[in-house]
Amino acid sequence: MAITAAASRLGTSAFSDAPPVELRANWSEEDLETVIRAVYRQVLGNDYVMASERLVSAESLLRNGKITVREFVRAVAKSELYKEKFLYGNFQTRVIELNYKHLLGRAPYDESEVIFHLDLYENEGFDADIDSYIDSPEYTNSFGDWVVPYYRGFNTQPGQKTVGFNRIFRLYRGYANSDRAQAEGSMSRLARDLATNRANTVVPPSNSDTAFAYYTPSADVPPRACLGGSFGESGRVYRIEVAGIRQPGYPGVRRSSTAFLVPYEQLSAKMQQLQRTGARIISVNPA
């Protein structure tokens, strides 16, 4: 049964009928490999893992029955591989967002959760912060020792805040999307909404049939140009936001987003012009 009537448009169809991945008693080698792949996919944000990067020692302990799936998840989350992908070079709020997504399968509900983990990280370090997710009653009640963490924010569950449904779609950008391959890079996705206690808009992921890649800059980006047009339905104005324009006069690194206001009748021509400059169009919305 679909999570919502718009499951295909929101990119959640892959999770509609998929049961949780669990390592059951009397498992086969194929079952074990399925669990290991699921852990890497979930905990590493669907980022590609080379054979040389796999945690062979932790996999061996799981294979020999020395550790549980929960402990294997802990080993991956504390590994240098995880730190290189999601800790180093990321804003700390972004790290916390990803920890919630990877380890508890949801987004932070409010700023108090972020503050708790910021304090824990500052006072006790990264490993202690990871332990606080995996040893929490929420993790135990949701996954126990043998179930691989999965995205729970798409469904209504006991103790879940309604705003969590909106928030998860700022972190989840499609089944095939990687947490390291998004236009916003290392910036926090939820800091502003959490600070203002505001529910964000649910925007379909970039791989759906009706959505462009979604990007919200850390500070509001004013339009660089507004092209005049006629009034009326055909003259509706759209806001095009782009990154990576390779021309003199445009920011190359620090301010990666540039916005244009374009009337409907000029929209197609303007998009083609921008693409010829090497720009990546990251959102097109009515102004």
Curated annotation (Swiss-Prot):
Rod linker protein, associated with phycocyanin. Linker polypeptides determine the state of aggregation and the location of the disk-shaped phycobiliprotein units within the phycobilisome and modulate their spectroscopic properties in order to mediate a directed and optimal energy transfer. It holds the Pfam family PBS_linker_poly. Belongs to the phycobilisome linker protein family. This is Phycobilisome 32.1 kDa linker polypeptide, phycocyanin-associated, rod. SMART domains: CpcD. It is a peripheral membrane protein. One of its GO terms (cellular component) is phycobilisome. InterPro entries: CpcD-like_dom, PBS_linker_dom, PBS_linker_sf, Phycobilisome. Coiled coil: none annotated. Its main location: membrane. It comes from Thermosynechococcus vestitus (strain NIES-2133 / IAM M-273 / BP-1). Keywords: Antenna complex, Membrane, Photosynthesis, Phycobilisome, Thylakoid. GO terms for biological process: photosynthesis. Residues 235-287 form the CpcD-like domain. It is found in: Cellular thylakoid membrane. Residues 2-180 form the PBS-linker domain.
